């Protein structure tokens, strides 16, 4: 008598696999969303890309944490096809799903990154602080920090606008009402002093 073999689901780490599947689905969705944004005829604002990238990074951290937390269970889990799996017609799919070795392209990429990392010197906190201070100073030199002009505009002789506060126009005794101050802070409306 040929009875179908019932799979034993007792030792399957369902919780670990489900949490991993959920995290992978989230990362896949975020990557697709980011790719769709980048392939639009006009790029979206950088803030939108930045937000999507931050979401993706958060999800990658969550995925990494899940893998680390479940690593013992996942390393001990062995997968195999059920007897009813069509191995003759789906041999390629089965080989891909059961693959233990990294794809050759991924292995080459990992080796390339390892080789590049060999030349990188890890900095101490003090060295990093010095480098950051130098980088900020270099960036500071690119701008005129006393107004709304770039270094290029200053070098080209563009004259900065002269801003005169309403009190200076009206004299020493001029006072602004609370409504005028709130209109300026909330809407940017310049107050007029009578």
Curated annotation (Swiss-Prot):
Gene Ontology terms: biological process = regulation of transcription by RNA polymerase II
The family line of this record is: Belongs to the Mediator complex subunit 8 family.
Q: Does the keyword Transcription regulation apply?
A: yes
| Cell compartments where the protein resides | Nucleus
What species is given as this protein's source?
Yarrowia lipolytica (strain CLIB 122 / E 150) (Yeast)
Role, per record: Component of the Mediator complex, a coactivator involved in the regulated transcription of nearly all RNA polymerase II-dependent genes. Mediator functions as a bridge to convey information from gene-specific regulatory proteins to the basal RNA polymerase II transcription machinery. Mediator is recruited to promoters by direct interactions with regulatory proteins and serves as a scaffold for the assembly of a functional preinitiation complex with RNA polymerase II and the general transcription factors.
Please state the protein's primary subcellular location: nucleus
Any one GO CC term of this protein is: mediator complex
Q: Which keywords describe this protein according to UniProt? A: Activator, Nucleus, Transcription, Transcription regulation
Which PANTHER family did the record assign?
MEDIATOR OF RNA POLYMERASE II TRANSCRIPTION SUBUNIT 8
Q: Which InterPro entries has this protein been placed in?
A: Mediatior_Med8_fun/met
Q: Which GO terms describe its molecular function?
A: RNA polymerase II cis-regulatory region sequence-specific DNA binding; transcription coregulator activity
| Keyword Repressor attributed | no
Quote the protein name from its UniProt record.
Mediator of RNA polymerase II transcription subunit 8
State whether it acts alone or in a complex, and with which partners, per the record.
Component of the Mediator complex.
**Name of the gene this protein is made from:** MED8
| Xref: Pfam families | Med8
């Amino acid at each position: 008598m040929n009875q179908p073999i019932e799979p034993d689901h007792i030792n399957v780490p369902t919780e670990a696999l489900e949490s991993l599947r959920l995290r992978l689905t989230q990362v896949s969705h975020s990557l697709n969303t980011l790719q769709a944004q980048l392939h639009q005829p006009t790029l979206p604002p950088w803030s939108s890309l930045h937000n999507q990238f931050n979401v993706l990074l958060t999800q990658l951290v969550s995925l990494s944490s899940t893998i680390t937390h479940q690593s013992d269970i996942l390393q001990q889990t062995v997968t195999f096809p059920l007897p009813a799996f069509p191995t003759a017609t789906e041999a390629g799919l089965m080989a891909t799903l059961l693959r233990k070795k990294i794809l050759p392209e991924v292995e080459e990429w990992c080796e390339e990154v390892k080789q590049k990392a060999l030349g990188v010197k890890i900095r101490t906190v003090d060295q990093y602080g010095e480098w950051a201070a130098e980088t900020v100073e270099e960036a500071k030199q690119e701008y005129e920090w006393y107004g709304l002009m770039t270094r290029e505009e200053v070098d080209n002789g563009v004259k900065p606008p002269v801003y005169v506060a309403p009190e200076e126009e009206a004299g020493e005794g001029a006072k602004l009402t609370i409504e005028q101050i709130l209109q300026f802070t909330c809407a940017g409306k310049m107050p007029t002093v009578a």
